[in-house]
């Protein structure tokens, strides 16, 4: 996701005719609170983006002070006022639509909206408060088209919009994204989903320290920062990437496969498949810039196309799981939570250890009846250990 922010909106991939796509991703990471979504993002390039943008802020502060002195001198000498320096911005926390337009109009490569909670991003853009044109404007951000916004005081023009969006969401709140309203106008379908899975057993203190040392001085971190740095250096340079014929055939055939899959699905999932068809080429463009040594001068090759299909299969599986979660009734949701909790506890735990954390999700009698059904259907194995009742995954 951080690569989507770094690459900016001046890079496009040519599919056919005048159909082009940018590497703009909208990502919702699904996982319970406290799972470590933010630290993971920081380790996967977020810290580097923050460091880079902080450097830009320092440069802007210095340039602004110099500009203020120049303005003062110009007034004294009755000269034209010098041009105000531009504050370079690559990403922002949840902001209003008005602020987004103001920043984007000064940063033509676009800016990402990154937050711990994806709902706060949408609420900041008045997604749930605004009606009519406000909602349509939010939807149009995903399309990466131009934005002409006349106001009482001025008219801001953004020739080419680029606003990647990323944030986390708890599984219980998924219905706020995949709602009937969001399904009708395509808001839900615009999101890629990523389910975060917790390891059954926490790492030991020794292993935790070892991992920290590996990350701080690893060659992987150096390569990651070097790659993101390359993208940032290239982000202000417009370029259109074409595909080698073999790569083009692979991706277009995969797009055809998604069309067929979509037609066999319900209306909500059909809309998701339609957006995933465009995401094929957005992801391909992003991978091209990540792996190609000279991405601005090279065609997208067959190897990148195959990598793209692998990544897209991951997102398709996560989409199916996300939409499947919405279709679960309350009993099915509690059953999933019981199974997930047993898995989190290492695949084997006492009934009490599973039941206690889920007391807000199900009453005692409801929990017991669903647990009994899971045991009867073979989803869980129940054994007695003295007075304690143990349950485990098969």
Residue ranges of predicted features:
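Phosphate-handling catalytic cores of nucleic-acid transaction enzymes
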Residues: 1-394
């Amino acid at each position: 996701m951080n690569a989507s922010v770094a690459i900016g909106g001046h890079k496009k991939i040519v599919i056919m005719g005048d159909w082009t796509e940018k590497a703009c991703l909208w990502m919702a990471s699904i996982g319970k609170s406290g799972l470590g979504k933010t630290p993971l993002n920081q380790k996967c390039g977020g810290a580097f983006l923050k460091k880079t943008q902080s450097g830009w802020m320092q440069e802007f502060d210095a340039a602004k002070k110099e500009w203020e002195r120049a303005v003062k001198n110009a007034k004294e000498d009755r000269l034209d006022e010098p041009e105000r320096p531009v504050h370079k911005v690559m990403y922002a926390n949840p902001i209003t639509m008005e602020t987004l337009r103001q920043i984007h109009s000064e940063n033509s490569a676009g800016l990402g909206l990154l937050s711990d909670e994806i709902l706060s991003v949408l609420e900041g853009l008045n997604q749930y408060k605004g009606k009519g044109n406000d909602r349509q404007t939010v939807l149009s951000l995903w399309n990466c088209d131009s934005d002409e916004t006349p106001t009482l005081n001025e008219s801001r023009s953004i020739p080419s919009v680029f606003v990647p969006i990323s944030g986390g969401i708890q599984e219980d709140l998924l219905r706020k994204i995949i709602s009937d309203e969001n399904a009708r106008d395509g808001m839900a379908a615009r999101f890629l989903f990523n389910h975060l899975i917790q390891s059954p057993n926490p790492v030991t203190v020794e292993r935790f320290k070892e991992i920290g040392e590996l990350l701080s001085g690893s060659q992987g971190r150096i390569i990651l920062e070097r790659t993101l740095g390359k993208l940032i250096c290239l982000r202000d340079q417009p370029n259109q990437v074409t595909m080698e014929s073999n790569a083009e055939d692979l991706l277009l055939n995969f797009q055809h496969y998604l069309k067929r899959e979509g037609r066999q699905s319900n209306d909500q999932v059909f809309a998701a498949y339609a957006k995933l068809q465009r995401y094929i080429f957005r992801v391909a463009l992003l991978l091209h810039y990540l792996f190609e040594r000279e991405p601005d001068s090279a065609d997208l090759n067959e190897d990148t196309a195959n990598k793209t299909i692998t990544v897209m299969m991951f997102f398709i599986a996560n989409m199916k799981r996300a939409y499947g979660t919405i279709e679960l009734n309350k009993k099915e949701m509690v059953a999933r939570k019981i199974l997930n909790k047993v898995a989190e506890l290492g695949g084997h735990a006492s009934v009490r250890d599973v039941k206690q954390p889920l007391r807000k999700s199900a009453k005692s009698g409801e929990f017991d009846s669903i647990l009994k059904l899971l045991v009867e259907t073979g989803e869980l194995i129940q054994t007695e250990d003295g007075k304690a009742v143990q349950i485990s995954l098969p």
